[in-house]
Swiss-Prot record:
Skewed-composition ranges (Basic and acidic residues): 64-76
Protein's gene: tatA
Protein name per UniProt: Sec-independent protein translocase protein TatA
Family matches, as InterPro entries: TatA/B/E, TatA/E
BP GO terms, sorted: protein transport by the Tat complex
Membrane topology designation: Single-pass membrane protein
PANTHER family referenced in this protein's UniProt entry, alphabetically: SEC-INDEPENDENT PROTEIN TRANSLOCASE PROTEIN TATA (PTHR42982:SF1)
Biological function: Part of the twin-arginine translocation (Tat) system that transports large folded proteins containing a characteristic twin-arginine motif in their signal peptide across membranes. TatA could form the protein-conducting channel of the Tat system.
Claim: Nuclease is one of the keywords in the record: no
Species for this entry: Leptospira interrogans serogroup Icterohaemorrhagiae serovar Lai (strain 56601)
Subunit-structure text: Forms a complex with TatC.
GO cellular component: TAT protein transport complex
Compartments in which it is found: Cell inner membrane
Length: 85
């Protein structure tokens, strides 16, 4: 139940609340959600790189390459048929 707090080690609730309060004072209420989102995105990409998962851009490139291969094959098969006729 408290597994996410294991990252903080021996920090108690009062220390965590104090850190959050200082972060609120430093960055303000408007920037704090965007900073938390950016931090979450960074952690997510770090975990993906550790597990070896590819990002969306490499998947899109591989899909585009797969789409282009059948087009090239159809061109070569048509040219072979026209040469044999």
């Amino acid at each position: 139940m408290f597994a996410p707090l294991a990252v903080f080690g021996s920090l108690g609730w009062t220390e965590i609340l104090l850190i959050l309060f200082i972060a609120l004072l430093l960055f303000g209420g408007k920037r704090l959600p965007s900073l938390a989102k950016d931090l979450g995105d960074g952690i997510r990409s770090f975990r993906k790189s550790l597990t070896g998962e590819s990002d969306d851009s490499s998947q899109q490139i591989s899909q585009e390459q797969e789409r282009s291969v059948p087009k090239e094959e159809t061109k070569t098969s048509k040219s072979k048929k026209s040469k044999s006729a």
